[in-house]
């Protein structure tokens, strides 16, 4: 079944924040080192943001005074990553539309009804249900850019009468990723009087591993399992007390995800035996959490419901030819296969 998805012109992945210090004329970093944009006078700046030149990324901009930003190499790399993730989201949208039409074809009498779903930030990594719940996670509003949604993010379900429990959704929204630790701000200022093995925050030796957006570091899960063999690992190796904290948080998140899946299955009338077991947490790309591979189990609930309904309404057709099963008197009455004629 072919599905036509109109491509959406989205420039958000080309948008960069302008350096406020540069606008005041007090930025001490050059444009090749500052993590914010230093646009020229010809660039259009709106609300402290500037759009990068797509032709410049391809190395083919010939405009004399381009109104778009020509980013330096380090910002160009960031934009290229954003572009790849944007393509992944567009492909996921197309495949999601195909799955929706397939689910609608399986249940022609039950129209697809949108059900309110908890909102997800631009990163899948910030949604605990998307990261740890195999039933609700694949059908994530993060697969659809927020700017094309008319209202709050919605989850499409094949059962029009069953809503997703709002309490469970709100509880899952509060859960955070367990492979991140907050960096000690006192340690960053150089005046933390607690040692690395006593402070409840991370003390990373390398400042490059710190995510400046939320002041956190990503924990090396291989090190937690005792199998990291990298000579210079780009992830944080936490001390023993922080390892115990991470393991406890993972256990709590897994228990909450299992409880939420069970509650949703009970509300939708699906027995637990129909649902597959909980898999491991899917790997997420570090930049914005977009999954590189589309999950084929995106409509596990819908397919399970469809199978249950089809089993109830489908008539039994025994194998064999219809003529062979017709009584002999009926065949003679209708003059079928009579050699005397």
Swiss-Prot record:
<feature type="zinc finger region" description="C3H1-type 4">
    <location>
        <begin position="214"/>
        <end position="240"/>
    </location>
</feature>
<dbReference type="Pfam" id="PF22628">
    <property type="entry name" value="zf-CCCH_10"/>
</dbReference>
<dbReference type="GO" id="GO:0008380">
    <property type="term" value="P:RNA splicing"/>
</dbReference>
<dbReference type="InterPro" id="IPR054429">
    <property type="entry name" value="Znf-CCCH_Muscleblind-like"/>
</dbReference>
<dbReference type="GO" id="GO:0005634">
    <property type="term" value="C:nucleus"/>
</dbReference>
<keyword id="KW-0694">RNA-binding</keyword>
<feature type="zinc finger region" description="C3H1-type 3">
    <location>
        <begin position="178"/>
        <end position="206"/>
    </location>
</feature>
<keyword id="KW-0862">Zinc</keyword>
<keyword id="KW-0507">mRNA processing</keyword>
<keyword id="KW-0508">mRNA splicing</keyword>
<dbReference type="GO" id="GO:0003723">
    <property type="term" value="F:RNA binding"/>
</dbReference>
<feature type="zinc finger region" description="C3H1-type 1">
    <location>
        <begin position="13"/>
        <end position="41"/>
    </location>
</feature>
<dbReference type="GO" id="GO:0010494">
    <property type="term" value="C:cytoplasmic stress granule"/>
</dbReference>
<keyword id="KW-0963">Cytoplasm</keyword>
<feature type="zinc finger region" description="C3H1-type 2">
    <location>
        <begin position="47"/>
        <end position="73"/>
    </location>
</feature>
<dbReference type="GO" id="GO:0005737">
    <property type="term" value="C:cytoplasm"/>
</dbReference>
<keyword id="KW-0479">Metal-binding</keyword>
<dbReference type="Pfam" id="PF00642">
    <property type="entry name" value="zf-CCCH"/>
</dbReference>
<dbReference type="GO" id="GO:0008270">
    <property type="term" value="F:zinc ion binding"/>
</dbReference>
<dbReference type="GO" id="GO:0007399">
    <property type="term" value="P:nervous system development"/>
</dbReference>
<comment type="function">
    <text>Mediates pre-mRNA alternative splicing regulation. Acts either as activator or repressor of splicing on specific pre-mRNA targets. Inhibits cardiac troponin-T (TNNT2) pre-mRNA exon inclusion but induces insulin receptor (IR) pre-mRNA exon inclusion in muscle. Antagonizes the alternative splicing activity pattern of CELF proteins. Regulates the TNNT2 exon 5 skipping through competition with U2AF2. Inhibits the formation of the spliceosome A complex on intron 4 of TNNT2 pre-mRNA. Binds to the stem-loop structure within the polypyrimidine tract of TNNT2 intron 4 during spliceosome assembly.</text>
</comment>
<comment type="subunit">
    <text>Interacts with DDX1 and YBX1. Interacts with HNRNPH1; the interaction in RNA-independent. Interacts with RBPMS; the interaction allows cooperative assembly of RNA-bound stable cell-specific alternative splicing regulatory complexes.</text>
</comment>
<dbReference type="Pfam" id="PF14608">
    <property type="entry name" value="zf-CCCH_2"/>
</dbReference>
<dbReference type="InterPro" id="IPR000571">
    <property type="entry name" value="Znf_CCCH"/>
</dbReference>
<keyword id="KW-0677">Repeat</keyword>
<dbReference type="GO" id="GO:0030326">
    <property type="term" value="P:embryonic limb morphogenesis"/>
</dbReference>
<dbReference type="GO" id="GO:0001701">
    <property type="term" value="P:in utero embryonic development"/>
</dbReference>
<protein>
    <recommendedName>
        <fullName>Muscleblind-like protein 1</fullName>
    </recommendedName>
</protein>
<keyword id="KW-0863">Zinc-finger</keyword>
<dbReference type="GO" id="GO:0007519">
    <property type="term" value="P:skeletal muscle tissue development"/>
</dbReference>
<dbReference type="GO" id="GO:0000380">
    <property type="term" value="P:alternative mRNA splicing, via spliceosome"/>
</dbReference>
<feature type="modified residue" description="Phosphothreonine">
    <location>
        <position position="6"/>
    </location>
</feature>
<keyword id="KW-0539">Nucleus</keyword>
<keyword id="KW-0597">Phosphoprotein</keyword>
<dbReference type="GO" id="GO:0006376">
    <property type="term" value="P:mRNA splice site recognition"/>
</dbReference>
<dbReference type="GO" id="GO:0043484">
    <property type="term" value="P:regulation of RNA splicing"/>
</dbReference>
<dbReference type="GO" id="GO:0003725">
    <property type="term" value="F:double-stranded RNA binding"/>
</dbReference>
<dbReference type="GO" id="GO:0045445">
    <property type="term" value="P:myoblast differentiation"/>
</dbReference>
<comment type="similarity">
    <text>Belongs to the muscleblind family.</text>
</comment>
């Amino acid at each position: 079944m072919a599905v036509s998805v109109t491509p959406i012109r989205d420039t958000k992945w080309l948008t960069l924040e302008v350096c406020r210090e540069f606008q005041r004329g007090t930025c001490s970093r050059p444009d090749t080192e500052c993590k914010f944009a230093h646009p020229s006078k010809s660039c259009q700046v709106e609300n402290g943001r500037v759009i990068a030149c797509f032709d410049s990324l391809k190395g083919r901009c010939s405009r004399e005074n381009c109104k778009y930003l020509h980013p330096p190499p380090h910002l160009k790399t960031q934009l290229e990553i954003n572009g790849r993730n944007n393509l992944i989201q567009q492909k996921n949208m197309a495949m999601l539309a195909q799955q929706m039409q397939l689910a609608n074809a399986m249940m022609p009498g039950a129209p697809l009804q949108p059900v309110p779903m908890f909102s997800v930030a631009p990163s899948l990594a910030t949604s605990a249900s998307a990261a740890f719940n195999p039933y609700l996670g694949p059908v994530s509003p993060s697969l659809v850019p927020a700017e094309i949604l008319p209202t709050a993010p919605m989850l499409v379900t094949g059962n029009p009468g069953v809503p997703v429990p709002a309490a469970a959704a709100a509880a899952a929204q509060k859960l955070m990723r367990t492979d991140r630790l907050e960096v000690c701000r006192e340690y960053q200022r150089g005046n933390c009087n607690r040692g690395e093995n006593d402070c409840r925050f991370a003390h990373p030796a390398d400042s490059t591993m710190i995510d400046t957006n939320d002041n956190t570091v990503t924990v090396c899960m291989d090190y937690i399992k005792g199998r990291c063999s990298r000579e210079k690992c780009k992830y944080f190796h936490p001390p023993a007390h922080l390892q115990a904290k991470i393991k406890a948080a993972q256990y709590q998140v897994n228990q909450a995800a299992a409880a939420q899946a069970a509650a949703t299955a009970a509300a939708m009338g699906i027995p637990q035996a129909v649902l597959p077991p909980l898999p491991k947490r899917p790997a997420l790309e570090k930049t914005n959490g977009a999954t590189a591979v589309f999950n084929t189990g995106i409509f596990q609930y819908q397919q399970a419901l469809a199978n249950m309904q089809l089993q109830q309404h489908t008539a039994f057709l025994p194998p064999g030819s219809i003529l062979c099963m017709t009584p002999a008197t009926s065949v003679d009455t209708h003059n079928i296969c009579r050699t005397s004629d």
